[in-house]
Each structure stands twice: as C-alpha cells, then as structure tokens.
C-alpha cells in the first residue's frame, strides 16, 4: 500500500468517546514511519495509529491542536514476514484513566509503554466525527504504510478486546476470526475482508474510496499465509520487491553470490517443494 491509501468522511457524527479499531497487517520495511489509521480535524492531525522510525507502535490522540496523549510501546516490531493484529479500544467515559485507551497486539493487551498518556474523561476524539478518516497514510503528513492490510473493522459506540477479532489455536498461535461478531454502530465498518474490497461488508454501507494508487489483491493474507521473500536479506542493491514481497525483480547484472532469500514457510525436514514463475522483465 506504499502508494495507496483509503479514505472516507462520515456524513453524520457518531460516538466520538467510545469505539474500537481492529486491523491485520504485514509491514515490509523497518526504520520508517508507517501510518495505519489517521483522522484529521480542524487542520490538525488529531488521531494516529502508526509505527515510529524506531519500529515502536504509537497510538496517539491529539486535543486542541497542541500536544497530545498516546501510547508508545516498549516492544519493537521488525518482523517483515509475519502478520500482525492490532486492536485499539477507546472509551473516554471510563473513570480510570488507563481504561480509556487500550492497545492489543496479537491477542495480548500491551501494558508496558515507553511513553503513556490518556485522554481526559469524556473527551471527544476525532474518530466517528464528520472529518476525513484515512487508512494507509497520514492526513496531515505523508508517511504511507508500506505493506499489506486485511480485515479492517471500526465500531461506533462499543468497545471490544482482541478476542472479538481473533483467537488462539491449539498450538497457542493467534489467528484471525474471518467472520467476527460485533456491533458496528452507525459509522462502523468492515473492509478488506475478501481480497481488496473497500465496499463496507458490515451491516452498514460505509464504503471507502481509493485516495490514490491501485489496490492489489495478494494470495498472502491473514487467513492464508504464503511464503515471501525476505526484504532484509538482499546481498546486493537493486532488488525490487512487490505484490506483498511475493515478487522480486533485479535490475542490472547479477553477479555470483548476489541473492535474496525466502523467509517464511521454510521447513527443515520432510518432503517439500518450491514453485515459482520466472519471467523476463522488460
């Protein structure tokens, strides 16, 4: 989605105090800022969910156009081969400050932060307001998301934890619920549930539009994992990855010892094979 983002502006105001955002994603780069969700009000970015240049996840809320409150994880997220699941649950009506914003990653609530701040009780956030909501790029800045996204949900008026959208399998691995049960509310939505569909697939009709670029459907998704090339492993420059790191192109002359390596689904025992299509790049 590096050159692509999605946009929607609600036609009416929903619940700005209580909401939940859930998304599955795979990032392709480290050391750069990736915007997952961005909402802008009155010329200022007032809400952002993103990775910092240090690969920490930041869930930021801004009020009054100056400063802000937010959660910045201690954890660093540098895996470019696996799918992540994030849930951001906000309810500013709660009496306890730490209950007003909660962050879940791969099923676990994050409670240790390098920086933390919580909104005032009953504060109105920008979410579910009649301003632009972007997925995959900042409203106020650039910072595009370079990676894949799948099964994106927003609720209006209801909070959920991660178990509404995922569950642990018999091996203790967090996996997706492809048809989660939740109440979307008036401005809630479900998009990118089946491939690259940005038509709302909840009980509403809160469709998104393509802000720029082209959406590309990939077979690698949160419910159908594919082996991908390792974006961190090229032994020479000029390797260009695309289509969810399932396609690689090398420009110029390839010398002995120059390569890029696969990263996922590489068994060390048993019988297996690799299938690839080799084409001449014009």
Q: Which residues fall in each region the model found?
A:
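Extracellular glycan-interaction patches encoded by glycine-rich segments
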Residues: 125-149
């Amino acid at each position: 989605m590096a050159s692509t983002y999605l946009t929607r502006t609600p036609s009416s105001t929903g619940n700005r105090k209580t909401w939940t955002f859930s998304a599955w994603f795979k990032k392709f780069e480290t050391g750069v800022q990736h915007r997952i969700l961005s909402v802008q009000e009155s010329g200022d970015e007032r809400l952002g969910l993103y990775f910092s240049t240090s690969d920490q996840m930041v869930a930021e809320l801004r009020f009054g156009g100056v400063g802000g409150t937010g959660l910045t994880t201690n954890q660093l997220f540098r895996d470019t081969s696996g799918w992540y699941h994030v849930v951001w649950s906000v309810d500013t009506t709660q009496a306890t400050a730490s209950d007003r914003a909660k962050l879940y990653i791969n099923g676990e609530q994050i409670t240790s932060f390098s920086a933390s701040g919580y909104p005032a009780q009953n504060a109105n956030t920008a979410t579910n307001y009649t301003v632009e909501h972007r997925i995959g790029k900042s409203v106020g800045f650039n910072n595009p998301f370079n990676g894949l996204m799948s099964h994106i949900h927003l609720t209006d008026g209801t909070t959920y934890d991660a178990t509404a959208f995922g569950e642990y399998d018999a091996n203790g691995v967090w996996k997706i619920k492809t048809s989660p049960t939740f109440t979307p509310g008036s401005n809630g939505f479900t998009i990118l549930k089946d491939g690259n569909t940005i038509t709302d697939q909840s009980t509403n009709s809160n469709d998104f539009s393509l802000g720029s670029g082209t959406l590309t459907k990939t077979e690698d998704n949160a419910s159908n994992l594919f082996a991908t090339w390792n974006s961190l492993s090229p032994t020479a420059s000029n390797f260009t990855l695309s289509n969810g790191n399932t396609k690689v192109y090398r420009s110029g002359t390839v010398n002995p010892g120059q390569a890029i390596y696969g990263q996922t689904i590489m068994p060390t025992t048993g019988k297996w094979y690799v299938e690839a299509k080799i084409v001449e790049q014009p």
